[in-house]
Curated annotation (Swiss-Prot):
Signal peptide: none annotated. One of its GO terms (molecular function) is ATP binding. InterPro entries: P-loop_NTPase (IPR027417), Thymidylate_kin-like_dom (IPR039430), Thymidylate_kin_CS (IPR018095), Thymidylate_kinase (IPR018094). This is Thymidylate kinase. It catalyses: dTMP + ATP = dTDP + ADP.
């Protein structure tokens, strides 16, 4: 039976490495070619929206509300045109970010009203949600240090530390209240983090009959 697995976390949390570990673990269980997605993005139209969110426009500031609407527009395209069709075909989907990112970054970081965020989510997604979310938790200071070491920062990554602290608080709030979210301490050494991801995913796969 197809499943939708998402990897979440702040900048520098090691999501890319986590995704590799997830894909390798799934392959060991015979799930060799899952559909992989990223948000924002993942379709031609959604990638255009990603560029606006990540880079903005040189001649016009992107308002927080416009950013929020772009993110949900991109998500609607991806879910409707890629994720749901793949799941309907019986394929597994592994996503780099999903709605939890908006709840954390726009709801927590930007400070949008909780009711508005839930209304946006429910309007665009209804009862659709990932079967499993692996949240890579990291101290924002360490995460930003890692992100800076990778090179030039995008528009979101250039936000001040308190933005990411608020985003992390919201991430943890959801993670502590939703059994479908597994929290990994991403501030540890790479080997420990890798083992934690594999162990958690293996246990989840066994529990879910794979």
């Amino acid at each position: 039976m197809s499943k939708f697995i998402v990897i979440e976390g702040l900048e520098g949390a090691g999501k890319s490495t986590a995704i590799k570990n997830v894909l390798a673990t799934l392959a060991k269980h015979g799930i060799t070619s899952p559909v992989t997605t990223r948000e924002p993005g993942g379709t031609p139209l959604a990638e255009k929206m990603r560029e606006l969110v990540k880079q903005g426009h040189p001649d016009e500031p992107l308002t927080d509300m416009a950013e929020l609407l772009l993110l949900y527009a991109a998500r609607a395209q991806l879910v409707g045109n890629v994720i749901k069709p793949a799941l309907a075909r019986g394929e597994w989907v592994v996503g780099d970010r999903h709605d939890l990112s908006s709840q954390a970054y726009q709801g927590g970081g930007r400070g949008f009203d909780r009711e508005l965020m839930m209304t946006m989510r429910n309007t665009v997604l209804g009862d659709f949600k990932p079967d499993l979310t692996i949240y890579m938790d990291i101290d924002p200071k360490l995460g930003l240090q890692r992100a800076s070491a990778r090179g030039e920062l995008d528009r979101i990554e250039q936000m001040k530390l308190d933005f990411f602290e608020r985003s992390r608080e919201r991430y943890l709030e959801f993670a502590n209240s939703d059994e479908s979210i597994i929290t990994i301490d991403a501030g540890q050494d790479l080997e420990t983090v890798t083992n934690s991801i594999i162990t958690a995913l293996e246990a989840w796969l066994v529990k879910n009959g794979n």
